[in-house]
C-alpha cells in the first residue's frame, strides 16, 4: 500500500480566526500570531495579500516561529475587527503574549512582509 505524504504537516498553515476562537487561538497562543483582517469578497488588495500569505509566507521558515491567521471582517470576525480597531483592509496585526505589538495596513511584497514580521517578533 502506497503511503501518501501529507504536505500540510511540513509547512505552516493559514488559520481561520473568528469571534469565537480569537481568544484561545490568538491571545492564548504560545507563539506570536500574525493576523490579517480582510474582506476577500470585494477587496483586491486583500485578495493579493491572501495569495501571498497562502502561497509564499506560510511556506517560509518564519512560519516555524509564528502562527498565521486570517479574519473575515465582513463575516465571522466582525466583533474582533472592531475591538482591534481595524479601520481599513487589509490590516495585519502581530500579537505576542496576548498583546498587539505591531500593525501594518495594506498589501506588500512577500519579502517586505517577512522582514516586518521578523523585526517585530525579536
Predicted features and spans:
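Chalcogenol-based redox active-site neighborhoods
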Residues: 2-12, 47-51, 70-71, 83-84, ...
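Short pre-active-site segment immediately N-terminal to redox-active cysteine/selenocysteine motifs
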Residues: 30, 38-42, 88
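Nucleotide phosphate-binding site architecture
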Residues: 23, 44, 74, 101
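Thiol-based oxidoreductase modules, predominantly thioredoxin-like and allied folds used
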Residues: 15-18, 37-39, 50, 54-78
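N-terminal leader/targeting and pre-domain segments
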Residues: 1-33, 110-122
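Structural alpha/beta surface segment adjacent to cysteine/selenocysteine redox centers
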Residues: 79-89
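The canonical Cys-X-X-Cys-His
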Residues: 43-46, 92
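Non-catalytic, surface beta->alpha helical segment in thiol-disulfide oxidoreductase systems
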Residues: 88-122
Amino acid at each position: 500500500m502506497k503511503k501518501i505524504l501529507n504536505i500540510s504537516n511540513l509547512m505552516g498553515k493559514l488559520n481561520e480566526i473568528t469571534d469565537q476562537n480569537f481568544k484561545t487561538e490568538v491571545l492564548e497562543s504560545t507563539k506570536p500570531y500574525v493576523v490579517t483582517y480582510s474582506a476577500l469578497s470585494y477587496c483586491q488588495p486583500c485578495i493579493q495579500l491572501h495569495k501571498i500569505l497562502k502561497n509564499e509566507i506560510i511556506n517560509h521558515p518564519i512560519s516555524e516561529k509564528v502562527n498565521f491567521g486570517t479574519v473575515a471582517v465582513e463575516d465571522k470576525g466582525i466583533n474582533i475587527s472592531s475591538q482591534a480597531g481595524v479601520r481599513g483592509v487589509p490590516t495585519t496585526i502581530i500579537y505576542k503574549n496576548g498583546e498587539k505589538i505591531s500593525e501594518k495596513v495594506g498589501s506588500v511584497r512577500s519579502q517586505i512582509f517577512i522582514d516586518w514580521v521578523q523585526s517585530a517578533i525579536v
